[in-house]
Amino acid sequence: MSKVIGIDLGTTNSCVAVLEGDEPKVIQNPEGARTTPSVVAFKNGETQVGEVAKRQAITNPNTVQSIKRHMGTDYKVDIEGKSYTPQEISAMVLQNLKNTAESYLGDKVDKAVITVPAYFNDAERQATKDAGKIAGLEVERIINEPTAAALAYGLDKTDQDQKVLVFDLGGGTFDVSILELGDGVFEVLSTAGDNKLGGDDFDQVIIDYLVSEFKKENGVDLSQDKMALQRLKDAAEKAKKDLSGVSQTQISLPFISAGESGPLHLEISLTRSKFEELADSLIRRTMEPTRQALKDAGLSTSEIDEVILVGGSTRIPAVQEAVKKEIGKDPHKGVNPDEVVAMGAAIQGGVITGDVKDVVLLDVTPLSLGIEIMGGRMNTLIERNTTIPTSKSQVYSTAADNQPAVDIHVLQGERPMASDNKTLGRFQLTDIPPAPRGVPQIEVTFDIDKNGIVNVTAKDLGTNKEQNITIQSSSALSDEEIDRMVKDAEENAEADKKRREEVDLRNEADSLVFQVEKTITDLGDNISEEDKSNAESKKDALKSALEGQDIEDIKAKKEELEKVIQDLSAKVYQQAQQAQQQAQDGAQQTQNDSNVEDAEFKEVNDDEDKK
């Protein structure tokens, strides 16, 4: 079975890992980084993803960041006259990670385990699955981020019984889950969280502070200037990271705006204590779900054996201190908060392929599920923190005499009134035979699969007529839309590939022109006028082709010039060899001459010898 990669699709950064042997390995992207910014930029018809997209966020208005916050909604991004759904933007990030994995493995990748915040509802999970499909990935499993982190942490500790609290504060979401680990079983006891709280919010309090201070000093509101705001965002993110290691940082943004007297510069010193004061309400917001998770699991803080911190925002010292104070123990420092989720997803991929044995993952549904009943109330069928997959049925009846149909309004949430909860979908069971109210027996069944995705069935027990629905929220995509987006993604990938090839070809051709000019100059009188003229002619032909748009012509002219330069190089090489041979022959002759010694001779008189 082919490899199943693990992907942490994050709000600000994403990460991809694969199981090698028994160990999960994080795959570096082409820039050599282990995480990739979840940023997509559109420029001159080209799509760019990752660091290259993030770098142009200040100057390019067609840059999309933190799209994960809009998953499962009907939000759209309008770029260059075209609308993109959050699923399509996320698919571009996933496709980039898929390409990274394929380059590393040297093989096609089409299966993945993708993580989501534990507190993601059904619509958000379905949107994530759709994004994977658009990117050309078969999503084998959607698992919760804290659960994935616990898998990576506990893989080599299967012989120990532990209760672990995972505190996951990412770029845009916050989750806390409590798991019980033992004998290879990873059982989630409870989960809680806040889908609208993350590192972006910590950046925002710094941005608001900088805007306020600058306005006080200069009377200019930077929040109305889009380009200034992006510079502030980058500076705030950097300052937040700096303050995890130092107690004070300098924020310097020259020419941030202009006033009547000329350009204005922002120079502010931000201390860690000031940042902690600004972020205090956000940190306190993380404590309520933590207490809720403990309460739902029926545990006290003293029963927690280990605390695992996940997500880049847990590097903030005040966050670590708050967790330590609440739970009463130091957090575990043995995992990388940016990479541990992707590693856990890769382990789950190994479980699916059979490469990891004796590991069982028992996850839970984060929110209660039910339907609307008389009086606008919500009747819960499946309580939150129920282990999945699961199924639950309940029998209802009609509210009026001879009622021909019933509306099933499917809800997710914890509030008693239907209107205060999230609507997952609506459908109708029709053709109910005429009968007094309360007589028809309508059985409603909720089924949640291992990915946390809901299927609902309504059945008239009198006629056995059945109607079912796989929940499709208002933001969900139809199969036709997904197929169209898959096709678009493939075409874009092909177009991007062609564009890259064209850029590479033009760069190679430019380089060749320069090389030929240099070679002709260096050789001087060592080449014949005929060869020189031929090379010049082919070089000029290539330069002329480069000014046009005919790629095939550039390719042909480049090949012609390459042949000329090869022939020229061969001739020069032969000349050099001949010259070297002649030099060696001359040196040998000189040496032979110098080896002839002048001999002394004496004239011999034969007559005298005979005497």
Curated annotation (Swiss-Prot):
What ranges does the record list as Low complexity composition bias? 574-591
- The residues forming a coiled coil are none
Identify residues that carry Phosphothreonine: T173
Query: Ranges of Basic and acidic residues compositional bias?
Result: 529-542, 599-611
GO MF annotation list? ATP binding; ATP-dependent protein folding chaperone; unfolded protein binding
Q: What induces it?
A: By stress conditions e.g. heat shock.
One matching Pfam family: HSP70
Please, which domain of life does this record's source organism belong to?
Bacteria
The membrane spanning regions, by residue number, are none
On whether ATP-binding is a keyword of this UniProt record, the answer is yes
Q: What keywords appear on the UniProt entry? A: ATP-binding, Chaperone, Nucleotide-binding, Phosphoprotein, Stress response
Q: Where is this region: Disordered?
A: 525-548, 573-611
Known InterPro entries for this protein?
Answer: ATPase_NBD, Chaperone_DnaK, Heat_shock_70_CS, HSP70_C_sf, HSP70_peptide-bd_sf, Hsp_70_fam
Q: Which family does it belong to?
A: Belongs to the heat shock protein 70 family.
Q: Which NCBIfam families match?
A: PRK00290.1 (NF001413), prok_dnaK (TIGR02350)
Role of this protein: Acts as a chaperone.
What this protein is called in its record is: Chaperone protein DnaK
